[in-house]
């Protein structure tokens, strides 16, 4: 009897220890504000969830862009754009940037350095072809929303809002942030398109809580979120983050933090994730450079869905990308994520991504080595690997398998649909497929375009990571 009681007590303590993680650092789990936010987020998850994910896979492969077409939007949106002309002029002066335009991930001097432009601008994949290599990109920033593909295709961020210019890197007031700071921008109620007046390195004192309908657009400036807390999107929707460098993120102690204009509360300790997506929907992360965070680079958990992670460059990290964190969280069955045109580069160990429950389309990414494995999962996720290049670690013959399945015997995981098509394998890398060998996308093929062969990924991912755009020049 005493043994049974002791066992129950241990179980209670273990469950209690999980609550801060499950609650995403909300110190007061009875806070009515967060309870309501969670309920609202579940509604957005149901709205964002696509009952036929294969249709979105087709959408990713199909969509054509006519770069000659003006896609500025409705008359109302054009009027808003006209009113913003003075703001754009302020941040569009060539004197605000003395840096050269970028060529891409180069092999020049210095590891991980950008090489100098030696020819005309080139855009190497469909997302970039939608907006890059156009000299007026800075005056037409919001055209970016027409370029997203994959499960995050409905994301518009701050398209319908005004432009907010961040002028200061300071982050010294968590409850009443100063106007002109990034923290002040992201807590506003209305949609905003957030840009930066000049280069800056922002050391966040506590996690940065972003509200819905925001775009953080770092094009034209060299913006680093580093050596402090990370970025959190909790129970929010419709957010674009583009062009940031996120690195050396560390744990933060928590405390009173404002997460919107009308609410602040006590947050617990943050783990040190670079970007945390918690119960959030319609999220697009594009051209992000990430490395060396204390926990994960990107975590998307607790029913987050309708996410595209594209054109990003990941280096020097252990747990790269976690999609679903709880084995018993059924909300993650609705998780749908596209991982496309990314470069998983030097010094990475595992989780590129690691998936629970959800549906993930991994397409045309470049995997240049890993220490343990590249793609992993548990709880029966569906993983479609299309047109990726996998280069196994040259001196670790026991770690040449791309895939890793956890918490299941072969008799169970053999039924999970993990399929590989048009992938390229080097250094004896191999992808262990499972599920139906005749598994095909059974859906409308009105505009079906198949993924590029994995041999093309070096070109498709050439400009992965934050771009060094110069205002007035093709980016």
Curated annotation (Swiss-Prot):
SUPFAM superfamilies: Pectin lyase-like. Residues 1-24 form the signal peptide. This is Probable pectate lyase 7. Its cofactor is Ca(2+). The keyword Lyase applies. Pfam families: Pec_lyase_N, Pectate_lyase_4. The active site is at residue 351. The keyword Metal-binding applies. Belongs to the polysaccharide lyase 1 family. The lineage of its organism: Eukaryota, Viridiplantae, Streptophyta, Embryophyta, Tracheophyta. Residues 91-117 are annotated as: Disordered. GO terms for biological process: pectin catabolic process. Ca(2+) binds at residues 271, 295, 299. Glycans are attached at residues 67, 96. Pathway: Glycan metabolism; pectin degradation; 2-dehydro-3-deoxy-D-gluconate from pectin: step 2/5. Its EC number is 4.2.2.2. GO terms for molecular function: metal ion binding; pectate lyase activity. Keywords: Calcium, Glycoprotein, Lyase, Metal-binding, Signal. Binds 1 Ca(2+) ion. Required for its activity. It catalyses: Eliminative cleavage of (1->4)-alpha-D-galacturonan to give oligosaccharides with 4-deoxy-alpha-D-galact-4-enuronosyl groups at their non-reducing ends. InterPro entries: AmbAllergen, Pec_lyase, Pec_lyase_N, Pectin_lyas_fold, Pectin_lyase_fold/virulence, PEL.
